[in-house]
């Protein structure tokens, strides 16, 4: 993992600047912040400590972050891009589109589609009319090849057997391309013999848009062979030309696979095609030790907090690769994540499947066996990781309290802390174990990290430090204190272990 650490530029969409230009001084020139380092001028990486993205992700690369001691991992999330509420809206939009398929079949023509389009096989079952029972058709876009089972309805033919993706991407008939007629004809005579019965003139097209009220579908689900295209191969509509693509892109020689779901296109409540985006497909997480490029990481999402204390038994769908698809609902795609039975009552049932034993997975403490090394621990459920985030650190689960949703975790400092079992933690040790063992051969290496020289308190003025001032080299006086007057020697307690009334 150490040799595979990538030290190139980070994703611009996942970085931000700390707008601090005071250099640690206030308006009077007094130093208010000591040893700030060089972090104020660096690009800060946005680390996802909440791990609130989709449930499955692939590690694209391990990066070096100059702002923290550990390494970070760039994860591309491949499952559950849309939240459950968005998935429901997307399914309702599909049902509305299927009901209006016949209407679009009368208004749209497929004669203008290129012949190089992909062949689509589609099966549909409808129970609306006797003639719309089971239609199995194979449609070659740009041609008029239909099987015998295709039903012909209306002057423009029936499109009930066509997939909805093709109907959404069809061009209106009055936008069909028109070639010029013979040179012997002039004016409108050159266009009149070439204008078919299924095409409109410019004036007829305007009347059709205003009088019929037929909506014009703008969708990016079908790629045309001509026209401007985005980087992902999708057609750009007229109103999107010139806009900047704000989707995160990979820097350097790394490329993004074509099958990675970035966003799903659906029809919103207003009826116009729009893109549903909930969370970015790329996020930074703290890299665990032994986490390599290409590994799969998982985020646990429990719909009911009460079920987090139950025992987990993987279902048959866990081993089915077809279960990890975006088209499924959130409950179906994560059904094997929901535990069953009693878990905290017996210590003989601490059995986890392979997903729970993988390094880098973020799951609740109630689902982790006793003795497991964890990091990135939450203090409150859903708050985000607050404990054990430094390089090479780890905590250990010591005990799980019976009949209560709490467990005891031993932190790197040796303190045993009682934490809610619904809080999530990441399995493994924080990466970059040798961070504390490095040696600086010269003072410049420390300055490269943004660390300024340490100035003694006796060398300062009285206004800057309690030990400052005096004639010549002064010794003695008060015990060693910090610039704010707190004792710095041993024996001074800074943490209150127990509070008593």
Swiss-Prot record:
Main location: mitochondrion
Location of the protein in the cell: Mitochondrion
Alphabetically ordered keywords of this record: Mitochondrion, Ribonucleoprotein, Ribosomal protein
Record's compositionally biased regions (Basic and acidic residues): 464-474
GO biological process, one term: translation
SUPFAM superfamilies given in the database record: Nucleic acid-binding proteins (SSF50249), Translation proteins SH3-like domain (SSF50104)
InterPro entries named among the record's database cross-references: NA-bd_OB-fold, Rib_uL2_dom2, Ribosomal_uL2, Ribosomal_uL2_bac/org-type, Ribosomal_uL2_C, Ribosomal_uL2_CS, Ribosomal_uL2_dom3, Ribosomal_uL2_RNA-bd_dom
Gene Ontology molecular function, alphabetical: RNA binding; structural constituent of ribosome; transferase activity
Region (Disordered): 187-217, 459-501
GO CC terms of this entry: large ribosomal subunit; mitochondrion
Polar residues bias: start-end ranges: 198-213
Gene3D superfamilies associated with the record: 2.30.30.30, Nucleic acid-binding proteins, Ribosomal protein L2, domain 3
Top-level taxonomic group: Eukaryota
Family per record: Belongs to the universal ribosomal protein uL2 family.
Name of the protein described by the UniProt record: Large ribosomal subunit protein uL2m
Natural source organism: Marchantia polymorpha (Common liverwort)
Gene from which the chain derives: RPL2
């Amino acid at each position: 993992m150490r040799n595979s650490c990538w030290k190139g530029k980070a994703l611009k969409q996942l970085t931000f600047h700390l707008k601090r230009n005071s250099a640690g001084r206030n308006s009077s020139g007094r130093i208010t912040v000591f040893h700030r380092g060089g972090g104020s001028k660096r690009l800060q990486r946005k680390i996802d400590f909440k791990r609130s993205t989709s449930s499955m992700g692939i590690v694209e690369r391990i990066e070096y972050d100059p702002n923290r001691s550990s390494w970070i991992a760039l994860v591309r999330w491949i499952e559950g891009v849309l939240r459950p509420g968005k998935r429901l809206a997307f399914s309702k939009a599909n049902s509305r589109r299927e009901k209006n398929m016949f209407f679009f079949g009368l208004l749209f023509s497929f004669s203008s589609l290129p012949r190089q389009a992909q062949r689509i096989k589609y099966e549909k079952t409808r129970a609306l009319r006797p003639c719309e029972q089971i239609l199995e058709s194979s449609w070659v876009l740009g041609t008029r090849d239909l099987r015998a089972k295709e039903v012909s309805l209306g002057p423009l033919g029936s499109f009930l057997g066509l997939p909805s993706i093709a109907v959404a991407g069809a061009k209106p008939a009055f936008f069909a391309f028109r070639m010029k007629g013979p040179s012997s004809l002039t004016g409108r005579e050159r266009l009149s013999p070439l204008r078919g019965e299924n095409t409109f003139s410019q004036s007829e097209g305007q009347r059709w848009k205003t009088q019929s009220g037929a909506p014009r579908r703008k969708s990016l689900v079908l790629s045309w062979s001509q026209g401007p295209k985005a980087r992902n191969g999708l057609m750009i509509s007229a109103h999107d030309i010139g806009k900047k693509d704000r989707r995160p892109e990979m820097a350097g020689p790394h490329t993004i696979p074509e099958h990675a779901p970035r966003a799903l296109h659906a029809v919103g409540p207003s009826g116009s095609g729009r893109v549903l985006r909930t969370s970015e497909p790329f996020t930074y997480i703290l890299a665990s030790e032994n986490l390599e490029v290409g590994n799969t990481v998982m985020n646990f999402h429990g719909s009911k907090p009460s079920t987090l204390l139950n025992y987990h038994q993987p279902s048959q769908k866990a081993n089915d690769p077809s279960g990890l698809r975006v088209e499924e609902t959130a409950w179906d795609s994560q059904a094997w994540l929901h535990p069953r039975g009693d878990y905290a009552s017996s210590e003989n049932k601490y059995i986890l499947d392979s997903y729970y034993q993988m390094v880098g997975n973020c799951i609740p403490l109630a689902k982790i066996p006793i003795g497991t090394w964890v990091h990135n621990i939450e203090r409150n459920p859903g708050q985000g990781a607050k404990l054990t985030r430094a390089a090479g650190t780890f905590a250990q689960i010591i005990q799980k309290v019976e009949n209560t949703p709490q467990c005891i975790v031993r932190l790197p400092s040796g303190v045993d802390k009682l934490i809610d079992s619904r809080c999530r933690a990441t399995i493994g040790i924080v990466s970059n174990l040798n961070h504390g063992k490095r040696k600086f051969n010269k003072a410049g290496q420390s300055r490269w990290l943004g660390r300024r020289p340490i100035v003694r308190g006796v060398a300062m003025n009285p206004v800057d430090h309690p030990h400052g001032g005096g004639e010549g080299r002064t010794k003695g006086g008060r015990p060693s204190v910090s610039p704010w007057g707190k004792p710095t020697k041993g024996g001074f307690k800074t943490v209150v272990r127990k509070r008593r009334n």
